[in-house]
Amino acid sequence: MSTRRVWKQSEIKTNPLFSKMRSTIETAFYGNNVTPVTSVAQAYQLAAEEPGVIVLDMPVYKPCEQGLPADAKVLVTNDGKTTGRYAKARRIIGDEGIDEVELANIARDAVYDSRNKEWIAAQTIVGLDKKFTARAHLMIPKDHASILYSWIMNFKFFDAAVKEFYDDSLEIPEGDIYIYSDPDYIVPGHPGGLAIFDPAHNCAMILGMRYFGEHKKGTLTLAWSLANRLGYVACHGGMKRYNLDNGKSYTIGVFGLSGSGKSTLTHEKHDGRYDISILHDDAYIINTEDLSSIALEPTYFDKMQDYPVEHPANEFLLTLQNVGVTMDEDGRKVVLAEDVRNSNGRAIKSQFWTDNRVNYVDEPVNAIVWLMKDKTLPPILKIDDPVLASTMGATLATRRSTAEKLDAHVDPNALVIEPYANPFRTYPLALDYESYKKLFSECGVECYIMNTGFFLDNKVPKEVTLDLLERLVEGTLEFKPFYKYPNLEYVEVPGFEPPFQVREYHHQLHKAFEFRYDYVEKLIGHKNELPEEVLEVLKTLM
């Protein structure tokens, strides 16, 4: 499915796809101060010439195959104090309490006040299969060309080959995605930045925010919203397919915030014991009718905390954000990673990082795993009831990650709920709830919880999680009832046995489910209110 950029004149007057915000943003793209970027190589050159950008002595792997100059190098940009996404800056038009007229006024002023700047713009696609693909546009001041370059490499540049693919995709009655970004424009009263989203009209304006993740996830926010309207489930997680013997396969999706292990589990090769196909480690969609899955982006926006300079994965770097640089023994500028400079150092790695990559999985997904960091839960639980399975996704309990910018009063270690591990939802939560429940109730998808944090006082090591994952795929896990808690089963793991005989443990479980109950109860009467059955099923566990 492809979105639309042009219209017959007879379609324009009463077109519901236009709005105050969309018309303000799209109009800005046509100014005589905006220069279109027409190739990946041009974007690279502009980024390399941006003041402050560091050109490392680390070559890009297979540059020509990615549209880059043959001598292209890895580029570094550093943002300053902010090195993570700032959710508090988001304003969603259509949400209660949001004044569209006020935000439209801010948007028009932002465009006018920045008219003397030189701007650049580019196009990409989001969605890598002909069944779902949307064209996206980004404009940004030339002084921030590195953001545009990273954005182009994160998604897929709209070149001649992509145009042919796009033109052959099914057209849908939705407009292209438009994003206007001015990282230097500070709106009075919004010192941390302001990100205005009009998801119903596929557009956004990002003001005063330099972090690349705002632009990546801002684009995905609009694409996920669009996909939801077309009958897809938005997925912030990883998906891989195990291609087993006798023509069998096992497809699994893991959902979690940054730092939950979703990328690690997705890319794990299990010492070569399995033939594996990877869809993506962060962003995809599932069709609720045929259960096929589509990746939204070709590359990977990965943390650098576990990748010292000599790590083989660094061969596939394209750009780096918020990392250090030093000199090696041969006098070459190389990355100083592992979060020495600051937390949440990041990289865009090319699609060549995975030699087993696919953009579309037509086999039905077999299992969905909620990755949590809830110390009351054992390393793995199986959920046997569709209502409870979707409820536990809607009340996914975890810890905040370094990918987020938090205000000073926020405890980064506090247990929080992030429904379906997706903080980028713009539509009512109940839509996701019903979609996931349908997967579990009508489509035969199994549901599990994996605790990748602490169980009571013991850290669940990666090796334990991987062993459970392998046995899950092979069908050799032996589940037993989780005490008297209905529709929950667990696996006995040495060193992580639930102390059912200890009263305090049941009290902690009660508090954990009560925490979820209270969260859902507070949603009543608001945009994200969930069906009554969610509260009812949580009561059975309390």
Predicted regions and their residues:
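N-terminal accessory targeting/assembly segments
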Residues: S2-A161
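Gly-rich Lys/Arg/Thr-decorated short loops/hinges at beta-loop-alpha junctions or inter-strand turns
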Residues: R85-R91, D198-C203, N413-P419
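C-terminal non-catalytic accessory extensions
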Residues: K522-M542
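Conserved lysine of the Walker
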Residues: K262
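Short histidine-centered catalytic/ligand-binding loop motif
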Residues: I92-D99, M205-Y211, P423
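Pre-ATPase regulatory/linker segments immediately N-terminal to the P-loop/RecA-like helicase/translocase core
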Residues: H137-V187, D198-P199
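Charged, amphipathic alpha-helical linker segments immediately N-terminal to NTP-binding catalytic cores
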Residues: D176-I177, S181-L230, A234
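Glycine-rich, often acidic-flanked micro-motifs
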Residues: S2-A72, H236-L257, H267-E268, R273-D275, ...
